[in-house]
Every structure is written in structure tokens, then in C-alpha cells.
């Protein structure tokens, strides 16, 4: 298995990481608001090949804590993971951290599970496991 550790982080997704993201529709978004308290929620996720960003959506996103958190501090992280097999144990994981934008319009065209508002993450640190 291949590790990309935080000390050796890359800021652009590899072809294998992009392919993995395209195969997964759900991720776990982590944010923190002005109070610095963590918040993690499952959410729709998609790689934006044109911009090299991660678009995060859901229904009525503009009314959510995750959206308000991004508006408050402009940072987010997302984990996309799955378990290929339990015997042998074969997990895969992609963690992406970066600057985030709360975007009020244009999300509906991004795909299933997206409403009008969405969050866009600009990758600054990428950590992967089992995604070659």
C-alpha cells in the first residue's frame, strides 16, 4: 500500500485519486465555526476537473452549519473512504484539506445530491491510503 504522509503532502490530485473520487459519491466533511468546535457530516462530493477543486453539496446546503462554518473561517477538510474487502483487510482513503468557499448558486448542475448552494474546497494538503 502507498502512503502520502502530511509531511510530504502533494497539493494536486493524482490520476488514481481523481478516478477514486469519481467512483465515490459520498464523503465526510469536517469544518469548524467561529467557536472553533469541530463539525463532521456526510455529504455529496465531486471532483471539479476544470478547476482542480472538490465540490461538496447536499440539499439546502445554505441553511446548514457546514455552510456557515465555511463562511466564518474559510477552511474545510473532506474524507472519502471505503472498504474494498475485509479478508484481506483492504481500506482506501483520501483526505483533502484546504481553503473553502461557500458558493450560493450553481450547484444543481454538479450532479446528484447537489442543491443550488455548495462548498468548494481548494486542495492544499492531500493524504491517501490504498489509492494508487
Model-based region annotation:
Residues 1-132:
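Binding-site signature for planar aromatic cofactors or substrates
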Amino acid at each position: 500500500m502507498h502512503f502520502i504522509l502530511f509531511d510530504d503532502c502533494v497539493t494536486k490530485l493524482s490520476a488514481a485519486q481523481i478516478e477514486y473520487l469519481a467512483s465515490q459519491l459520498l464523503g465526510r466533511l469536517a469544518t469548524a465555526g467561529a467557536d472553533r468546535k469541530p463539525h463532521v457530516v456526510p455529504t455529496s462530493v465531486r471532483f471539479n476537473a476544470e478547476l482542480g477543486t472538490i465540490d461538496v453539496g447536499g440539499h439546502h446546503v445554505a441553511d446548514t452549519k457546514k455552510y456557515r462554518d465555511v463562511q466564518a473561517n474559510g477552511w474545510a477538510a473532506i474524507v472519502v473512504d471505503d472498504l474494498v474487502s475485509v479478508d484481506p483487510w483492504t481500506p482506501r482513503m483520501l483526505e483533502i484539506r484546504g481553503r473553502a468557499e461557500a458558493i450560493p448558486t450553481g450547484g444543481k448542475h454538479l450532479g446528484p445530491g447537489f442543491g443550488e448552494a455548495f462548498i468548494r474546497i481548494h486542495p492544499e494538503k492531500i493524504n491517501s491510503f490504498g489509492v494508487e
